Amino acid sequence: MTHIVLPQDILIRHIGERNITPYETLQQAADPSHCIHIAYIAEGYTEAEMPTFIKDCRIAMEALFAHEPFKSLRSRFNIVAVKAPSVDSGTSEPSKGIWKNTALHSHFDTFYSDRYLTTLHLKDLHDWLAGTPYEHIIVLVNTEKYGGGGILNSYNLSMAHHPQFKPVVVHEFGHSFAGLGDEYAYAKEEINMYPKDVEPWEPNLTTLVDFHNKWEGMIDKKTPLPTPEPTDLDKPNARRDKWKVGAYEPAGYAQHGVYRAYPDCRMRTNAHPEFCPACTQAITQLIKFYTEE
């Protein structure tokens, strides 16, 4: 799909290159004409804290490229760090009555969920990024509190100073970049997000209604569907080399009727070190879509 932009369009305001937010290039793609542009942007970092922001960006970047297929296709990414300064350090926590004056006005408690960290100020976000090379956005928030959020083709937002920063920022990028769904469910609360008679659009979830275009081709013919979880799942000494691609419950916030491809995945837990085969396949296809003619 192609969207044509005509620079001479009368509805396009020409502002030149003034007032561009300072940024640093963290990685240059091998071929700038066929690459994916990622911009990290600071949220809740004061001017004095920008060195910390750049350090956090490098940590997040290396965490992403520790995962396949990003690791093998790293040269196809161009990455910048955009230094958007905030008046206050940190982010807002409405449930505690804490409101901060920050570049993107981010806050926890989105939809009244304690750990759902987002911003609704998309115009501000893109104003800060104007004039910088970007397609996909990763917002790093200067907070120690656990939380984040990822919205497909919009942005990924993650806390930067919690011990689980690295797996969370990669997990959220799975949402915002590749449209991956969450592969977990809550034991005490089932969210009926996916009708059981409709195939989810997310490439790593299925209701088995229209499974043919997902990861069906990866499954051994002897593997039963649905597939029982291995008995060593979530145990320290799990024999992951014995795990198989299948259709496992729970997934997609539902205990039953929605399936994931593999026992564990970056889209299921923070403990698992990699994306599952279905997610890896989907991410690979998308990277090639962006970077190959």
Set out the residue ranges of the language-model regions.
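Solvent-exposed loop/turn segments at secondary-structure junctions
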Residues: G44-A48, P85-S89, T143-G148, P163-F165, ...
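Propeptide-to-catalytic entry region of secreted or membrane-anchored zinc metalloproteases
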Residues: T2, P7-H126
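Catalytic zinc-binding patch centered on the HExxH motif and its immediate surroundings
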Residues: G90-E93, I98, L120-M159
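Extracytoplasmic/secreted proteins, especially bacterial periplasmic and envelope-associated proteins
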Residues: T52, D56-A60, D124, V168, ...
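Active-site recognition of the HExxH zinc-binding catalytic motif
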Residues: M61, K166-E183
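Extracellular/periplasmic catalytic domains that process cell-envelope and extracellular macromolecules
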Residues: A30-H34, K71-R74, L129-Y134, R239-R240, ...
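Short pre-active-site segment immediately N-terminal to the catalytic Zn-binding motif
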Residues: M50-F53, G148-E172
